[in-house]
């Protein structure tokens, strides 16, 4: 054996070099194979995916243990990428943990993939084969910032304004803060001579507006092109500190307000007051109302007082024009609209509230009652006395231009459909004018609906039922209980077909009145103090002293808003 071996000098070198070389190569090769096979780097995976992308279908299963993803794991994947652990990695967690499944599907020419169930999905091969470096893919900018979208919206707004070109003074101008696409509310008029429906009937009502109203608005007010714009602004575009309502500040007045400085509440009230005073002489119905449909977190009481101060001090209440001509009463409405919201004109004589509570079925009036109301409206056209404290010479005569007498309270409420007016609290109550010429309660055609008043004293809002003083606002003298409910119900509640006289009937009438409230103000003072009011409504006749629980004081203490 020794003869077969090489020389002693070369033996150790050859054996050592061979063994070291052999073992070293084997260890290095095994390590290299393990690194490439079991631990592929993301760069290698990316290169492999690009290399195999042209093959129809290539699946490579790494030799390590592969776990089949269960349903709960599949639900946590987005486009095959696990979103549970490594959220921002463009590669699956199986590849990151050196084990898993890699499948590359060849992209068809049309970039449409058919799923197993037959559904199709379109995708972009560039975005799939080249995952983004950033944590998230670059998203297209917001659609609100696209100039093309804004230009398209402006074109639509212009086209929409051109379709309404038959009423040029009503062209909508977008105030600040309102994007053009959301401000396409139809301009409409509140004057609907024949009861054409709610103001929500946009396009139908638009073509039926009284033509004289449009001419009056276009001639007398050239600087105000928005006399009665869309009555409702979208709720989604309004800041949380702006009251969006259907009646407080119309879109027309909002467009004419000054935008150079931040709007102050007093300046807004002043501008609205001027607007109402200029609008008071027009033959159309004014848009200044003492009503807030959707009060916002900004100082509700301030806004209520501000809006009602406008409707209270803008113009003294004129004589109801329905006394002279019942069919033209809509042209002589005062600066305060009924707080019952949108109204219908059933026959041009009376207006009934249109929105009823869901738990109360509206009682429809028959023709007999309407005939009574028309007769009352026609009989109330007596000659008004010169002074406010003039006595009634006849049962149907009026007491003065600013004071509505006992008989005239009903026709004015019938014809003008004026409900209560929210007023700021006065420092001292206004004495009511005495009427001493009424020996007994007069019989009305529908007199069984009303209770007689107190002893020759006509109660007025915020009055102590004593003395006489000038009065600028109408009052409700004929409530169902005889009580001067200043936060009274809608006008239709006074004329419900109902029960006869007596305390029980009065209580029923009051409860019906409470349930019949349909405006945007639900009178909480009724429900809170109903028992006290019922007990005081049927006291013995006599001069009443101001009571802290009276409905007038209640109205001051509890401004009735939802």
From Swiss-Prot:
Residues 147-242, 537-562 are annotated as: Disordered. Coiled coil: none annotated. InterPro entries: FAM222. Residues 147-167, 183-201 have a biased composition (Low complexity). GO terms for cellular component: nucleoplasm. It comes from the Eukaryota. It holds the Pfam family FAM222A. Belongs to the FAM222 family. This is Protein FAM222B. It comes from Mus musculus (Mouse). The gene is Fam222b.
